[in-house]
A protein has these predicted regions:
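Short Asp/Glu-rich motifs
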Residues: 63, 136-137, 159-160
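Acetyl-CoA-dependent GNAT
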Residues: 23, 27, 31-99, 110-112, ...
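Short secondary-structure boundary/hinge segments and terminal tails
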Residues: 92, 118, 135, 157-158
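Conserved catalytic-core motifs of GNAT/GCN5-like acyltransferases
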Residues: 7, 128, 141-162
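Positions that flank functional sites
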Residues: 59, 132, 155
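Conserved glycine-rich acetyl-CoA-binding loop
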Residues: 97-111, 120, 124, 130-138, ...
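Terminal substrate-recognition subdomain of acyl/acetyltransferases
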Residues: 2-24, 160-170
Length: 170
């Protein structure tokens, strides 16, 4: 490799590092409250259409429930809802806006959730995913969720729910 090629390669790497540093400083993850239920409903309506507006509103009042969002430039691009009961947690909702998928935001949000579970001494984290959602299945496997069961004809389209579990070692 000549000096010019080496210089250009290093310049490109520096630009990439600088861009990533600026970009990650624009990302935040925080618990949100009932004032933002409309934004949750909008994200859900644009992605997996899981809950009605009324269901979203009620999520914020359930005991042991947290609604957490990942924000890019202070705009919500993803959400999870988790309910904790003693030493178990159930993910009842996890989604990233379509145009922000496969860019690492879901992984950042899941990592945040897992760290939160570890702080709370959760022994297992549970979720269900449609058998037709192979991308989500791969995503959850990346975080060591194992298939532990199935609910037949669970979703409106007749597909089964695949039950997943992640155990935390103490």
């Amino acid at each position: 490799m000549n000096v010019k090629t080496s210089f250009l390669k290093n310049k490109i790497n520096l630009k990439k590092i600088f861009r990533e540093k600026i970009f990650t400083s624009m990302i935040s993850i925080k618990e949100i409250d009932q004032k933002e239920f409309e934004l949750c409903y909008e994200l859900d309506s644009a992605t997996i259409c899981l809950w009605t507006k009324k269901q979203w509103q009620s999520e914020f009042y359930k005991s042991g429930t947290k609604v957490v969002a990942i924000l890019l430039k202070k705009k919500i691009i993803g959400i999870y809802v988790v309910q904790t009961i003693i030493d178990e947690a159930q993910i009842s909702y996890f989604s990233i806006k379509q145009k922000f998928r496969r860019k690492g935001y879901g992984s950042q949000l899941m990592t945040y959730l897992i760290k939160d579970c570890e702080k709370l001494n959760i022994k297992k984290l549970l979720l269900e995913v449609s058998e037709t959602n192979s991308i989500a299945e791969i995503f959850y496997c990346k975080f060591n969720f194992l298939t532990v069961g199935r609910r037949k004809n669970y979703y409106k389209d007749g597909s089964d729910a695949v039950l997943k579990e992640k155990k935390f070692l103490k």
